[in-house]
Amino acid sequence: MSNSQSEGQRQPAIVILDFGSQYSELIARRVRETEVYSLVMSYSTSADELRQLAPKGIILSGGPSSVYAERAPLCDPNIWDLGIPVLGVCYGMQLMVQQLGGRVEMATGKAEYGKAPLEIDDPTDLLTNVENGSTMWMSHGDSVRALPEGFVRLAHTANTPDAAVAYHTRSLYGVQFHPEVVHSTDGMSLIRNFVYHICGCEPDWTTTAFIEEAVSQVRSQVGDKRVLLALSGGVDSSTLAFLLKKAIGDQLTCMFIDQGFMRKGEPEFLMDFFDRKFNINVEYINARQRFISKLNGIVDPEEKRKIIGTEFIRVFEEESNRLGPFDYLAQGTLYPDVIESAGTNIDPKTGERVAVKIKSHHNVGGLPKDLQFKLVEPLRRLFKDEVRKVGRSLGLPEEIVRRHPFPGPGLAIRILGEVTDEKLNCLRDADLIVREEIREAGLYHEIWQAFAVLLPVRSVGVMGDQRTYAWPIVLRCVSSEDGMTADWSRLPDELLERISNRIVNEVRGVNRVVLDITSKPPGTIEWE
């Protein structure tokens, strides 16, 4: 999405049929990086439904199943006769081969997992500008044993004779690897070839057009009614606030609930930024003592989360009744939430069809049904990176657009064990030093998250010739693309030394700083 369309009635140029792959969402993101609008739909979508949608191309995702298994997920076989170009990825390729008369079996030799050099047999069409010998990411235990009539080999690897195949006259293509993952060095070239040259798509999924359409749709939906938004200061709710302000002006009211677990200076910054600098109506709700009193004596992290979430709902309900009435509730629901709620009925462990599980998403924590709000969700077809682009176009500063992720329960889950005012003040000061030093070093935007954690133990130290017995602070810095996996960040020794020295000298109650060098997996980014 560049700065030059939106959900609304826009039809997807590319439809991704999801067979339970962990990469289905990533395929959609990669297609959108070419400025072509894509949607993820269930593998069970019928050929008639696709005909009505009239996409210019269809991509079949990978998946955990085997196409020859009794309960394997199968697409409508009439899809092959729609005259729409199809690209099958991994399981999607095997399904195409199987349904059109070929044969797929369990690999008799080595299964392929990881990187493999691609040897190209036909460098035209799908593989134009894909370098011979380029690395592609493999993840399959089954292999094609016989191609259907009309198909030809485009490329192979050492262990996979048919790594890429095509039926040119019917515009049917398959690849045994995953071009969408970052490890596939020329994967985007292949995706662009399919999207632009084979499907004939135009790059019209742009930020400017999205904003114009979203503003029009919000105005049409809301009319002259009032809208309430729970503002957290994160990029999603901030972008939504700017978009709604542009669309409906003073009909928007934002509610900022300060539960006492935010970072140092954050509540003041957010109120100054939204209310005073940009004249967005923000109601500040100081609920600090109410929240912390509810956590008295609570040490279990899940119980802490539950208490904070429940109390948030109660405060939100009370204050919305006081400030209302409101007809609409604005939520920063994103496309990954929509995909997860829709659910693909594939068991990720067995690869078999199972009953669909529906999961609801509420950015304000699961609102009571009797609030009777109608929902406004203009961001529900955007991925996180697209939200950031929209935010920039609307005038959000980089300090919010590129703000590090921050958990909903805030510092309450970065204090292990019971949360007290003393611990909160200690952690706020330490966390501020971490962020200040990383910004000063020019590394803030190079790191996915950087923060401090306070442990519920004390250690012995010596300061000013006197014995100390104080808390340790854990420094947690990770690098990641999407938060699903992460590696610990290798910070310069000089930076680590400055952070440690400042914390033990400036933060009362701390005498030791330790570094967390655990990746995700096996660890998680947050400690609780």
From Swiss-Prot:
UniProt-listed CDD domains: GATase1_GMP_Synthase (cd01742), GMP_synthase_C (cd01997)
Cellular component aspect of the GO annotation: cytosol
Segments forming domain Glutamine amidotransferase type-1: 13-204
UniProt binding sites for ATP: 232-238
EC number of the protein: 6.3.5.2
Boundaries of every GMPS ATP-PPase domain copy: 205-403
Listed pathway(s): Purine metabolism; GMP biosynthesis; GMP from XMP (L-Gln route): step 1/1
Reaction equation(s) it catalyzes: XMP + L-glutamine + ATP + H2O = GMP + L-glutamate + AMP + diphosphate + 2 H(+)
Pfam family, one: GMP_synt_C
Coiled coil start-end: none
First and last residue of the signal peptide: none
TM regions (residue ranges): none
Keywords in alphabetical order: ATP-binding, Glutamine amidotransferase, GMP biosynthesis, Ligase, Nucleotide-binding, Purine biosynthesis
GO MF assignments: ATP binding; GMP synthase activity
Active site: 90 (nucleophile), 178, 180
PANTHER family: GMP SYNTHASE [GLUTAMINE-HYDROLYZING], GMP SYNTHASE-RELATED
Function: Catalyzes the synthesis of GMP from XMP.
Subunit structure: Homodimer.
Alphabetized NCBIfam families for the sequence: guaA_Cterm (TIGR00884), guaA_Nterm (TIGR00888), PRK00074.1 (NF000848)
Protein name, entry field: GMP synthase [glutamine-hydrolyzing]
Gene: guaA
